[in-house]
Amino acid sequence: APERTMQMTPEGQPMATMRQISQMELASGTRGRSAAQIDVWNATYGPVGADGYPRQLWDLRTGVIDREVATYMREKGYDLRHYLETNWPRIGPSLVGKLHLLTGDMDDFHLAPAVYLLEDFLESTKAPYYGGSFRYGRPMKGHGWQPMTNADLLREMAAHIARYAPAGEPTRDWREGR
């Protein structure tokens, strides 16, 4: 639906539709060369077309979805929840205690529902249980929300790494910024 809102304010007010963002990308460059969000997704997660350029998930002029590209992206890992569900027996053991997500509950690009689905899956894991965390910015926190400064986030990450570092692994130098 080209007139669907693609970007909104944290209060839920429309900022830009799919059509508007698609037109902006077309004006910035054709054949996946705008260097904007949609073209980046297509180049990163989509297949290469016969012409050597990334195939588009949807036609930026008409909004028509290319189902082959959608299937390719899902099967190749663009859908993180699907990838984790499909591969949990193999990759789950190496991810235990390592997945910690921060997100606003009113993401500008409608990503919060996908995060809720990811959390539902991870909370259902067994053998092994994922052992991570989800923190939501509420009420009405948008894209890029985090509950701390970047410096505080780095300190939290350093403490986590130090806590789980292999026995005897030196961590003092990098924790103190040397």
Language model region names:
Residues 52, 67, 82, 100-178:
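C-terminal catalytic histidine-bearing segment of alpha/beta-hydrolase fold enzymes
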